[in-house]
Design a protein with these regions (language model features):
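Metal- and O2-centered redox machinery and metal/ROS homeostasis
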Residues: 1-161
Length: 161
């Protein structure tokens, strides 16, 4: 993994997260009460800038359209579960990047992966409580959406330019 590989990965992640937050977060404002505190696009922008990507380039990155996939609260919950769950492994990813790329390369450039810092565990527990309450009775659709989100992310990251 090189710094350029990491920047390319963050660029793709930015397109997905930005589109998800823009189009799906509004569906969750009544289910996930602290949804406003879970926006992370700005952290990806900070990471990209730290890696030398200028604002004009960031602004031109594709904004994935999600309204067709996440039309219901259940679908939005499934997608949110995947995105919030990814932060649980963030500290491991950040440590790996520091080891591979060097502390001087990654310092201040892995804000997304350490979004909640020492509060990661408590934020996850709070999310799970709200998630379990909101998904009661619609578990099948939530699970299907989570699986679809994994599939969409896989396609997003493996598409050809």
């Amino acid at each position: 993994v090189t710094a350029a590989d990491y920047a390319a990965y963050l660029s793709l992640l930015y397109g997905f997260v930005k589109g998800f937050e823009k189009n799906v977060f509004p569906l969750l404002q009544h289910s996930i009460l602290d949804i406003e505190e879970r926006y992370k696009t700005h952290l990806l922008v900070s990471d990209l800038k730290g890696l030398g990507i200028d604002q004009a380039c960031i602004d031109s990155m594709p904004d994935r359209f999600f309204l067709e996939v996440y039309q219901s609260n259940a679908a939005a919950l499934g997608g949110m579960y995947v995105l919030e769950g990814s932060i649980l492994g963030g500290s491991i990813i950040s440590k790996h990047l520091q080891k591979i790329l060097g502390i001087e390369v990654i310092t201040g450039k892995s804000n997304y992966f350490t979004a909640y810092g020492s509060e990661t565990g408590s934020r996850w527990k709070f999310f799970l409580e709200a998630f379990c309450h909101a998904s009661s009775g619609i578990e099948e659709e939530v699970i299907e959406s989570a699986l679809q989100t994994f599939s969409t992310l896989n396609q997003w990251f493996n598409r050809t330019p």
